[in-house]
Amino acid sequence: MSNSRQHQGHFARKRFGQNFLVDHGVIDAIVAAIRPERGERMVEIGPGLGALTGPVIARLATPGSPLHAVELDRDLIGRLEQRFGELLELHAGDALTFDFGSIARPGDEPSLRIIGNLPYNISSPLLFHLMSFAPVVIDQHFMLQNEVVERMVAEPGTKAFSRLSVMLQYRYVMDKLIDVPPESFQPPPKVDSAIVRMIPHAPHELPAVDPAVLGEVVTAAFSQRRKMLRNTLGGYRDLVDFDALGFDLARRAEDIGVDEYVRVAQAVASARASG
């Protein structure tokens, strides 16, 4: 596989984190995992040169029900419009600030499916941005740096378990589906990649906790991950009786599962509300 940054007459731009998927076997495997169906409401983040876009449109789109896509590179937008016409509705802009809820169908039921080969330089902030739209999302299928996927699905007690693990596992059921080697891209990235499936927990499955408070507690816990929680969460002792909560502070952040972090966040929020 060539290391050239040019593919199909387009130069991949480092500032957009562009690595174009060119392995048709991998593309077929991704489409098989997504299983797009005619008439579904779906949006692709960063369609690039349309390697995944084309096969998905073939299974999903009609003139009255197009595939949606969010693309920042205006050079690519023109090419995509010319290639796919009314079967693709393009939204020019940055996925980090895009309102994905605007694409969902009106109503209380989840209606939106999100897919994409996410730019690796913004993957974590983009995943956090997407959390706010989880109530309208059916599922998400993303190509990401393998190291990020491993952190997303990591279990407590492992080195990969992180703030990202806790916050995303609180909101989604996630499965790593496919390993993707660097040579599947043009230009090849310097890291391995993987496909992950993310399905939001149903509302009745979500713990009653303020996500902002949970995020605050988890961020504090992982701020110095090699230190004991008595150091990183010590500032909450005025609000939380950790002994009564059955929460052992003589542990490190990566040793604590999602449920325990939720209990601490609930206690913090309750103490603030009553104080």
Curated annotation (Swiss-Prot):
S-adenosyl-L-methionine binds at N19, L21, G46, E71, D94, N117. One of its GO terms (cellular component) is cytosol. Belongs to the class I-like SAM-binding methyltransferase superfamily. rRNA adenine N(6)-methyltransferase family. RsmA subfamily. HAMAP family: 16SrRNA_methyltr_A (MF_00607). GO terms for molecular function: 16S rRNA (adenine(1518)-N(6)/adenine(1519)-N(6))-dimethyltransferase activity; RNA binding. Keywords: Cytoplasm, Methyltransferase, RNA-binding, rRNA processing, S-adenosyl-L-methionine, Transferase. Pfam families: RrnaAD. This is Ribosomal RNA small subunit methyltransferase A. It catalyses: adenosine(1518)/adenosine(1519) in 16S rRNA + 4 S-adenosyl-L-methionine = N(6)-dimethyladenosine(1518)/N(6)-dimethyladenosine(1519) in 16S rRNA + 4 S-adenosyl-L-homocysteine + 4 H(+). It comes from Burkholderia pseudomallei (strain K96243). PROSITE patterns: SAM_RNA_A_N6_MT (PS51689). Specifically dimethylates two adjacent adenosines (A1518 and A1519) in the loop of a conserved hairpin near the 3'-end of 16S rRNA in the 30S particle. May play a critical role in biogenesis of 30S subunits. It is found in: Cytoplasm. The keyword Isomerase does not apply. Its EC number is 2.1.1.182.
